[in-house]
Amino acid sequence: MTEVTIIIPNYNGKKLLENCIKTLERQTCQEFKLLVIDNGSKDGSTDVTSESLYMEMVALPENTGFCGAVNLGLEMTTTPYAILLNNDTEAEPEYVGELLKAIESSPKIFSVSPKMIQLYHKELMDDGGDMYSIMGWAYQRGVGQEIERYDRPCHIFSACAGAAIYRREVFEEIGYFDEMHFAYLEDIDVGYRA
């Protein structure tokens, strides 16, 4: 049984999307559905296909932003888990399998954030999940730091929605992403509500 749907929001990112899908074709765990929500692209993005994956492309007439796109994807999804994946990411071969293993380790886990590495500086972190400070501010964990410092799992306040897995039933309880956040900070808002 397919347990996870990967939802990729896209806006005029044809080349990025093609590369992202190629990395998904190399996943060791292929038990996923792929859903691309295109936000009214004019660059031919809706012509992108996969050679080996079943992929559904939903072409929206206008740009609804990150939240609008992923909310539609979450509404269309019937799998227990959903991975939200930015089109400019490159997933390592164990990505899907490791995220599934982590979220299935406890029914109390709502989301899991992978160790996100900078695209052009592979020795540096891009994001290791969001944390919450004593001052009441949320911040990205590990940005610009050496990746070796972030090899152990830890509790985080919220997962970066650019590459995280979520337990879909929790969204049904707390609501989807707030579309007032066209792009950015939507994942922190979900962390507050979860």
Q: Where on the chain are the PLM-derived regions?
A:
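Cell-envelope/extracellular polymer assembly enzymes that use nucleotide-activated donors
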Residues: 2-5, 33, 189
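Short, acidic, metal-binding catalytic loop of nucleotide-sugar glycosyltransferases
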Residues: 22-31
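A conserved acidic beta->alpha catalytic loop
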Residues: 23, 38-47, 62
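Glycine-rich, basic loop-to-helix element that forms the pyrophosphate-binding segment
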Residues: 60-77, 87, 98
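Short aromatic/hydrophobic "clamp" motif used to bind/position activated sugar donors
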Residues: 82
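Conserved donor NDP-sugar-binding/catalytic core segment of glycosyltransferases
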Residues: 90-133
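Short, flexible, basic/aromatic active-site loop/helix in glycosyltransferases
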Residues: 114, 133-156
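A short, conserved alpha-helix in the catalytic core of glycosyltransferases
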Residues: 157-194
